[in-house]
Amino acid sequence: MPEIELSNLTKRWGKFYAVDNLDLVISDNAFVTLLGPSGCGKTTILRMIAGLETPTSGRIIIGDRVVFDSDMGINVPANKRKVGFLFQNYALWPNMTVYQNIAFGLSNIKEEMPKVDYDAKNAARLAEILRKPSEAVEILNECRDKNGKLDEKRALIKLIDAFTISQYTARKLYNYHLEQGNDMSGEIAALDAKVEAAVNTHSNAGYKLSKTFEVTKGGRPVMETRKLTKEEIDLSVQRVSKIVKIGMFMDRYPSELSGGQQQRVAIARTLAPEPAVLFMDEPLSNLDAKLRLEMRYELQRLHVETGSTFVYVTHDQMEAMTLATQICLINNGVLQQYEVPLTVYNRPQNIFVADFVGNPSINFLEAKGAQAGDGSITLSIFQGRKAVFSPGTPLNLETWFARRDEEALEQERLYQKKLLDKSFVEKGNKDEAFRYHIAKVDTEDEALREDPVLTNEDMVIGIRPEFIEIDDAGILEGEVYGAMPTGMESTVKIRVDDFLLTAVVFGSALFTIGEKIKLRFTGNNVMLFDRK
């Protein structure tokens, strides 16, 4: 499956930038989730790659093919990009059966493909099965009801699965009535003669039949622009129905299926044309919580079995964390971080990423700090309490601040240079500093809070709830402000001075509101952010 490369991709409407100068490489066979808040540009990115939305500028490459380039004037239509799209609503035809819904798109495909002699191919396959009929006989005998009568529908499904044949070939095989023990030598001879006649016919016309019954000339397949045959369509439908496990529903209508079953049909329909890339736009949003969890496992399995490249849009960070091989986190059309899920969780690039990923949300504490000679950072937190932060890797704050200021100046220089370009359109939806939330007992309206003058001493501590441990040996005193036990864990709100911390406590311990406790921060995953 192909790699996808996006270069300087931008989409704007007037001064509103939905996607702002995005550079992204999606590896072959990756499962990438586009994650971010509503309106951040996730679906727009997906639609641009698929060809459903025309970018304002930039370049898109799928595999070794440029499908969009604003400078070269290239824009390959969506139906020529070999991609599949799965939407939030299943978009199934209510007047068609499951089989017809999956086959409908296949019946509309018309493109250049090898010429195949399916009559000869099916005759050869039938002769092969008839020469060793024991397996087919065993299958047929397994399909008898308690009265010994053969269940035709069940037998056809089993024959299709066992021999990977179409329903048309399976019916021919069924009609031989192998379970009756009849001599098949005459039928085998007739089938062999049919294959030989086809070989001779092609040979007389200057062609040959390959082992897969493709018509060849000079050792190369003969190509022709054609539609798929009913045999090819049926084989594709049977293949994908087996993958998503809906073979028993093929004769039902969408109204007769549950939400999860309808979603499986939509997935099968998308997979049937064998797209190079599969795009999914919040496909699980309409399902209940239990079914959504089950479908996540199904999508994981589907990704492995198909070997396809998956690009998945969601605002649910739990879906992103559990499904993705890489998370692409977007905010206001700008890429925030593109890493494997655990790196995004444990090593967020900025405060926005730390706040968005994680449930319950990360705890933020404002602090004043200065670096000591040994490299540690002495902090003042809460209402004047002292703490020491020891970086996991050696860090010189003065050097880091100098590099930060230099990068900010460089960005400003580049921006001023862009303003001189007459074709440049200034961004109306400005990129503003993320306003993180500090949980306090007396909540104030953060919109009314004045922005203070910040110095290099101003920092923000980030602590994940699972790294706050309630322990009698803890050095911080607190009070239980609220508790939500869920069985294997409890989410506890703890009051320390006027601040509220969220902790996750594993086990079945019960907490009472107002209870005095002690706590401490554990592990090496406490984060320190530059407040400026």
What is the meaning of each model-derived region?
Residues 50:
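Helix-to-loop junction immediately C-terminal to a conserved catalytic motif
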